[in-house]
């Protein structure tokens, strides 16, 4: 969508959305972006869409796969960050490298991102093309760095899984057993969820119960089905 709605789905009138956008996009292959931040519950929303029959491209999964598919990435890591991040089998020590990459300066982190992100974008585009070729009507890209890496410009509309910062910290602490400093490093390495609210079309408030989240997802699903 050219104009960013930036509204909570709990506040959006479904009939208004249908009248405004359904005719414009009727029959078009839709590329939807879902983003969030660490601990925002984005994966939960992604699974809900998948269970409703929408095909999902998982950018995190692709990020893991490109490490095996494109050897220059691991070579760059070993040469620039140290062999301690590569195990005896030639695989990336993900946790150790993750802790390191989020603790260094933004400039240094961007050097690594400039190596791996083009491969990730290539694989994402290939998957979109495949889904369109086999006749799918809609596909959702689940990508934590959707905004940071400017992927949204190639999508039809974007969705944010939003929670407040306190909820982020609590959820990540329970899930990943990280220190508060490690959690904050990861949160601060991304654009804040409050800033992302201004840059997306729809916002799902994922700070309450699963059922409240599901109601918002189902509303968006109904909207998607009219396109």
Curated annotation (Swiss-Prot):
The keyword Cytoplasm is annotated on this UniProt entry: yes
Domain of life: Bacteria
Pathway field: Cofactor biosynthesis; coenzyme A biosynthesis; CoA from (R)-pantothenate: step 5/5
Record keyword Ribosomal protein present: no
EC identifiers of the protein: 2.7.1.24
UniProt: ATP binding residues: 39-44
GO cellular component: cytoplasm
Protein's cellular compartments: Cytoplasm
Reactions catalysed according to its record: 3'-dephospho-CoA + ATP = ADP + CoA + H(+)
Main location: cytoplasm
PROSITE patterns cross-referenced by the UniProt entry: DPCK
Domain DPCK: 31-227
InterPro entries (alphabetical): Depp_CoAkinase, P-loop_NTPase
SUPFAM superfamilies assigned: P-loop containing nucleoside triphosphate hydrolases
Keywords: ATP-binding, Coenzyme A biosynthesis, Cytoplasm, Kinase, Nucleotide-binding, Transferase
GO biological process: coenzyme A biosynthetic process
Molecular function via GO: ATP binding; dephospho-CoA kinase activity
Family the UniProt entry places it in: Belongs to the CoaE family.
Described purpose of this protein according to its UniProt entry: Catalyzes the phosphorylation of the 3'-hydroxyl group of dephosphocoenzyme A to form coenzyme A.
Official protein name in the record: Dephospho-CoA kinase
Source species: Clostridium tetani (strain Massachusetts / E88)
Name of the gene this protein is made from: coaE
């Amino acid at each position: 969508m050219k104009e960013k709605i930036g509204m909570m789905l709990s506040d959006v009138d479904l009939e208004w959305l249908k009248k405004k956008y359904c005719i414009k996009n009727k029959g078009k292959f839709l590329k939807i972006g879902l983003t969030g931040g660490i601990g925002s519950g984005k994966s939960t929303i992604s699974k809900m869409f998948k269970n409703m029959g929408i095909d999902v491209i998982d950018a995190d999964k692709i990020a893991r796969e490109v490490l095996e598919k494109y050897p220059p990435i691991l070579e760059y890591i070993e040469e620039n960050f140290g062999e301690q991040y590569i195990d005896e089998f030639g695989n990336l020590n993900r946790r150790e490298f993750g802790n390191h990459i989020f603790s260094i300066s933004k400039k240094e982190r961007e050097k690594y991102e400039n190596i791996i992100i083009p491969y990730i974008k290539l694989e994402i585009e290939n998957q979109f093309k495949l889904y369109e070729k086999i006749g799918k009507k809609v596909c959702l890209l689940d990508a934590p760095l959707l905004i940071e890496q400017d992927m949204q410009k190639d999508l039809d509309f974007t969705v944010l899984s939003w929670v407040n910062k306190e909820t982020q910290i609590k959820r990540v602490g329970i899930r990943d057993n990280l220190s508060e400093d490690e959690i904050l490093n990861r949160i601060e390495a991304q654009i804040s969820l409050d800033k992302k609210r201004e840059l997306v079309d729809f916002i799902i408030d994922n700070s309450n119960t699963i059922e409240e989240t599901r109601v918002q997802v189902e509303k968006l699903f109904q909207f998607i089905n009219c396109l």
